[in-house]
């Protein structure tokens, strides 16, 4: 039996830079002039919610409101995804790396490694709210819900859980080769950040290719693509997928109470990953 440990997961909570990362990697690795636009990223990466793979795994069109049916078909769909290319390849996921109802959502026997992207929850909350067509308080509730899920119209799901549990599930997964990238570091020090990622992939960085890939996938250019071409991955009801692409928007978009709630829920994880925000958010919450 052939070794199917071919998937390099591009994992994140929604609105944490996954599309940006997929675009950047496509622009770096694909031949000049052949990198796909944002609506054709599936030419370079796959996703674990692809309807065609679930249909094939189900031996017919997959559609079900039941989590049990999704769990029944998912392992077969992931095996098909893993075997769809001869070597290692990137697969997007928003699922936690956990056992769910006795099943590994990220099967070790199909996994070569993972790139995990995270974004500070203060900026994530308003962006996630737009993604969910919800108000910010509702988005924060979902970020705090251990049972939070998203799904396609046909019932192919993303098991999100809480924001902090999501991070923990990936960065503490036993035996998983992983590399963690902060959204904020991509904004402020992209060349250095991507070089670290490429070295994790055992790829010697090419400075010229890297500079071109970073320029081609700047937030301004991705937003321009969405304006000109639309974006097929944008959820119904969401006006724009690429809204601001900045760090620190929480200062203008969150109330003191919302900042306090996020701090209260996620403080240990903030201390680990965003210590630079602790004092400012503490003062902001008190000032309300």
Residues of each region from the PLM?
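Hydrophobic alpha-helical segments and their boundary regions
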Residues: 6, 206, 234-237
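Poly-acidic low-complexity segments
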Residues: 35-37, 120, 189, 206, ...
């Amino acid at each position: 039996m052939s070794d199917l440990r071919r998937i390099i997961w591009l994992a994140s909570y929604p609105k944490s830079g996954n599309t940006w990362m997929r675009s950047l990697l496509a622009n770096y690795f694909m031949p000049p002039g052949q990198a796909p636009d944002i609506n054709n990223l599936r030419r370079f990466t796959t996703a674990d919610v692809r309807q065609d793979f679930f249909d094939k795994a189900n031996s017919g069109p997959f559609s079900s409101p039941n989590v049990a049916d999704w769990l029944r078909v998912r392992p077969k769909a992931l095996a098909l995804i893993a075997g769809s290319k001869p070597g290692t390849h990137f697969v997007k996921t928003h699922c936690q790396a956990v056992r769910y109802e006795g099943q590994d959502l990220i099967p070790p026997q199909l996994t070569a490694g993972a790139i995990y992207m995270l974004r500070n929850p203060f900026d994530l909350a308003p962006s996630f709210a737009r993604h969910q067509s919800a108000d910010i308080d509702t988005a924060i509730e979902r970020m705090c819900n251990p049972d939070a899920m998203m799904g396609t119209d046909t019932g192919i799901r993303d098991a999100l859980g809480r924001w902090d549990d999501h991070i923990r599930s990936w960065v503490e997964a036993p035996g998983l080769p992983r590399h963690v990238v902060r959204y904020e570091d991509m904004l402020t020090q992209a060349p250095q950040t991507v070089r670290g990622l490429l070295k994790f992939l055992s790829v010697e960085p090419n400075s010229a290719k890297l500079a071109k890939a970073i320029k081609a996938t700047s937030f301004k250019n991705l937003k321009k693509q969405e304006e000109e071409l639309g974006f097929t991955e944008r959820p119904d009801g969401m006006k724009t997928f690429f809204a601001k692409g900045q760090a620190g928007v929480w200062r203008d978009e969150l109330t003191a109470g919302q900042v306090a709630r996020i701090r209260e829920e996620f403080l240990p994880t903030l201390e680990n990953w965003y210590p630079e925000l602790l004092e400012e958010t503490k003062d902001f919450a008190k000032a309300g």
